[in-house]
Amino acid sequence: MQKPVLLLALLVAHPCMEAQPASALRVIDADLSMLRGSTSRMYNFCVGAGRANEGLRADWQRQLRHVRAECGFRYIRFHGLFCDDMGVYQEDKQGHPIYNWQYVDELFDFLEGIGMKPFVELGFMPGALASGPQTIFWYKANVTPPKDYEKWRAFITAFVGHVTERYGVDEIRTWYFEVWNEPNLTGFWMGTTGGKSDAEFAPIARSEYYKLYETTQRAVKSVDAAYRVGGPATAGSGWIDETLAYCSGKGLPLDFVSTHSYATTSGYLDENGNAGTVFSTDRNAITGEVKSVRSRMDRSAFAASELHYTEWSSSYTPFDPIHDSYHSAAFILDKIRNIGASATSMSYWTFTDIFEEAGPRMTPFHGGFGLLNYQDLQKPSYFAYRFLNRLGSVELKCNDPAAFVCRDDAGGVQALFWDFTIPHPVPAVIDQEYYKADHRAEHKGPAELRLSHMATGTYRMLAYKVGYRANDVQAAWLDLGSPSQLTRAQVATLRNASSGDPCLDERVQVGPDACFSRRFEMRENDVWLIELRPLR
């Protein structure tokens, strides 16, 4: 069925290599005989979620099935596997440990059933094993070191032994075991500085973390030496040099390096959204950090180790409307494109708004981290991943720095291109004020997709778009008056506004010149996915 045409899409009569003034036209040029190599899938290696217990919910599982199918995510990382709401550890009256893996089994079995694997964050501390009362978040995650490192070692050994027995050695060798989460932030590790300044306390916290790391990796590898253990899982790419030096000096394995990065001007932790965040106007934000860490690893004893950014996003608080806005899709694609092979994975934080660090949220759109909101509504950020997952297995060389052009085994071609514009006015304006409003995207002129050395014949051309008021569910919600609770009719309206249906679906012909050329109007932060499917 012919869809309404929402774009300027005129077949161009001139040959696909005809010159155009650079200032007048953006040209995305690809020759199907010029291959760059296999399409990188580092973008969907892993995705984040809030905490393990949320993974027992039907709506969480429904949403993960959806993003697994449409975006191709293979691993998932979450906090709280060892929190008391997972019931993993108690002690009897004599202080003997009691282990219980029933909730863990339920969650991991579900992941196995949909073809995903856990990227296992080993934390937080079970209450009965904790050395202190300090907690974080609404769900009271204990952030203190173990009261007895030998009991911690035995606990980790028992846990790893259990999953090995349940899923098999060969399977667990494909998992990752990450020691703790953001130990360079007092809120996540130790819980108190004891009156010391941050500078005075940092080496104390780091020393205690390395004790935890050493104990944990020995426990994991006592089950199987080939199991992968890494860290330091820090905020802001912190403690990288220190961790590389410590593990090298002690002869400890560091099978992978993990850390986090967010594109904000300052800060690392704000679960309640009270501080106010500011999106960085540095186009190299996140990208520069990743490349710097990879470079330092390459000069270390761990040059062969993988680099996993196990959290990243535009902002580190689940109360930032930039997460809901149309700006997010182009932001994500810009980072994925420019980071490239510097990271083994970039695990977006998170796939869902079902996220309870500050407790259940009271509105359908509140600046949550998720690609999907509570009602399964697809945000613009979701489409960045869905579009990436539509790319074929072979990437073509392309002259445009904000594009991927790929082909698949069936003879199809996919072109994904975007504009990444940072509209944030001045640092004095916080995200919570700027991105909650309706901001019209300015026109950027046409982009022309030119393909050469195509097979002659008829193709079905599908064009998909995300941008301002195009699969822009936040704008549609604003149009409804920003209701705090949604009726079924309103959900249906919003679902229709973010359906992801093609805005153009037609047949096109590639003639004897083997060229295809088409123009598409671009606005700020528009994203286009063009698919050409051969018709037999």
Question: How would you describe each model-predicted region?
Answer:
Residues A9, C16-Y176, K196-G236, K250-L252, ...:
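Non-catalytic accessory regions flanking glycosidase/transglycosidase catalytic cores in CAZymes
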Residues A233-T259, L307, W312-F331, K335-G340, ...:
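Substrate-binding cleft/loops of secretory-pathway carbohydrate-active enzymes
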